[in-house]
Amino acid sequence: MDVPAQVLRDYLTANDLEFEERDGSFSFGLPGEHKLQTPVRVDVGPHTLAVHAFVCRNPDENHERVYRWLLERNLKTYAVSYAVDHLGDIYLDARLPLVLVTPDEIDRLLGSLLTHADGSFNTILELGFASSIRKEWEWRNLRGESTRNLEAFRGWLETGASPEPDQP
């Protein structure tokens, strides 16, 4: 367990990622564009490196469509899979045998994790929080408030249409 933990520790340090380490677990954040930061926990176990990343809280609506979209995305991911916990919160999860823990493989794994956490974020919001986003948009426009952080949704908000995200 010492060698894989050291490989991970060295990787995080070399990439200027601040982390906390406790009892074989590493916690850190990966910066994104759509999702400002993805919280990640990596557990170094006796046989595997387990990676867990929080993507989004339990959607307010449209659960079946959100979960179906995530399951379809699982067919196209490298090393990571979408999962939900008992509260319905959405995660990306991965397992890597310790014998495969190298800086290059950690880079591929975390790259895949960030690509999918960040790249899916707006679609998950569109599918699972459209009503809340629409209310926020209307409230801000009525009061002359900035809608800058809602720009990704402007198209369907201005037309009054339902969001139609790209296929996975």
Listing of model-derived features with the role each one plays in the protein:
Residues 1-18:
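Amphipathic alpha-helical segments
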